[in-house]
């Protein structure tokens, strides 16, 4: 297995070196849709979850009754001041970056979706910004760390 420097997996390092990019809360709130406030609904068809706009007739149980598949940024908040997560969608499917936050506002995890499948690397951090978990979906590899950066578990994704 490949050796990892936990310092190079810290949130600060990845942000400073532009390995990952995180949208500001202001941008997400201004340009995104709130899952709890906007007319967007999750529908499962054929084993896939789609985010859709329901038509004016209410909330039907068939995709044909939806006025369109959602594309854009969707977010959910902790009250009015914090965001729980934001996620990109294209044609109703998870597609692009997803970022989840602790209730303190610090980043909890970061991952990338392609047509509702996780791709690349999923990073999860402790609230102090140290790496907690790294899952590399391209290499089918999973590594977990303690708060001091020591590997505690590794195996397949």
Q: Where are the regions a protein language model picked out?
A:
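Glycine/tyrosine- and acidic-biased, solvent-exposed loop/turn segments at the edges of beta-strands
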Residues: 1-157
């Amino acid at each position: 297995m490949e050796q990892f420097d936990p310092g190079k997996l810290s949130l600060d390092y990845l942000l400073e070196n532009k390995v990952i990019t995180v949208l500001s809360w202001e941008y997400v709130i201004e340009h995104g849709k709130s899952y709890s406030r906007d007319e967007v609904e999750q529908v499962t068809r054929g084993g896939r979850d789609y985010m859709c706009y329901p038509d004016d007739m209410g909330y039907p149980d068939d995709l044909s009754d939806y006025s369109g598949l959602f594309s854009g940024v969707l977010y959910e908040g902790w009250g009015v001041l914090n965001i729980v997560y934001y996620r990109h969608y294209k044609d109703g499917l998870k597609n692009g970056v997803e970022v989840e936050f602790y209730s303190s506002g610090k980043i909890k995890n970061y991952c990338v979706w392609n047509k509702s499948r996780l791709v690349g690397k999923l990073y999860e951090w402790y609230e102090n910004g140290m790496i907690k978990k790294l899952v590399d979906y391209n290499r089918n590899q999973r590594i977990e760390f303690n708060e001091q950066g020591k590997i505690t578990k590794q195996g397949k994704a």
